[in-house]
Amino acid sequence: MQLSPQEKDKLLIFTAALVAERRRARGLKLNYPEAVAYISAAILEGAREGRSVEELMSYGTTLLGKDDVMEGVPEMIHEVQIEATFPDGTKLVTVHNPIRLSVVPLVGSSQV
């Protein structure tokens, strides 16, 4: 199988994300590389499904909370950037502060 460097990178991300997903399912807290891979893979899949850049930027902040990761990890990840393939081409998706330190209720929601 002949893969381009970009395809190899995506396979590496998905492999790390699979490990992270399994560890999270067992109740283990994710470390830095696992958290980044978990978020990146979700963004790549969302792009493949046809979601917009704006949707994915927002979605990326809902995937993990501070209770899902090891101590110090939220402060280490200021942003996650991933080049994703959309139906209309490749675009860079940036998720700022992907792991929220506290949950802020959405305006107009019933969450308090």
Curated annotation (Swiss-Prot):
Pathway involvement of the protein, from the record: Nitrogen metabolism; urea degradation; CO(2) and NH(3) from urea (urease route): step 1/1
Location in or out of the cell: Cytoplasm
GO BP of this protein: urea catabolic process
Gene Ontology CC annotations of this record: cytoplasm
Name of the protein this chain belongs to: Urease subunit gamma
Provenance organism: Gloeothece citriformis (strain PCC 7424)
Cited InterPro entries: Urease_gamma, Urease_gamma/gamma-beta_su, Urease_gamma_sf, Urease_subunit
SUPFAM superfamilies named in the record: Urease, gamma-subunit
The protein's Enzyme Commission number: 3.5.1.5
This protein's encoding gene: ureA
Subunit: Heterotrimer of UreA (gamma), UreB (beta) and UreC (alpha) subunits. Three heterotrimers associate to form the active enzyme.
